[in-house]
């Protein structure tokens, strides 16, 4: 259900702006996206796992907030990460 340290390091290396960057919005969004994919698969198999479903909703909301922040501050990087991660553009006025 969680991502392996090797997979996490690979994601950080791919999306980091500079050496040792683990906190930039791009890295956080990429890690959350991987966790969301894994948890979605878990929920497909375990439909009654409401605790995990609530965690999934929280992760999706956090990713949406990070995407909105990135969209406000640097639209080019926002478009690039949306394309690379193959996720839909955030819509709505929240």
From Swiss-Prot:
Keywords: Ribonucleoprotein, Ribosomal protein, RNA-binding, rRNA-binding. One of its GO terms (molecular function) is rRNA binding. SUPFAM superfamilies: S15/NS1 RNA-binding domain (SSF47060). It holds the Pfam family Ribosomal_S15. CDD domains: Ribosomal_S15p_S13e. GO terms for biological process: translation. GO terms for cellular component: cytosolic small ribosomal subunit. HAMAP family: Ribosomal_uS15_B. Part of the 30S ribosomal subunit. Forms a bridge to the 50S subunit in the 70S ribosome, contacting the 23S rRNA. Belongs to the universal ribosomal protein uS15 family. One of the primary rRNA binding proteins, it binds directly to 16S rRNA where it helps nucleate assembly of the platform of the 30S subunit by binding and bridging several RNA helices of the 16S rRNA. Forms an intersubunit bridge (bridge B4) with the 23S rRNA of the 50S subunit in the ribosome. NCBIfam families: S15_bact (TIGR00952). This is Small ribosomal subunit protein uS15.
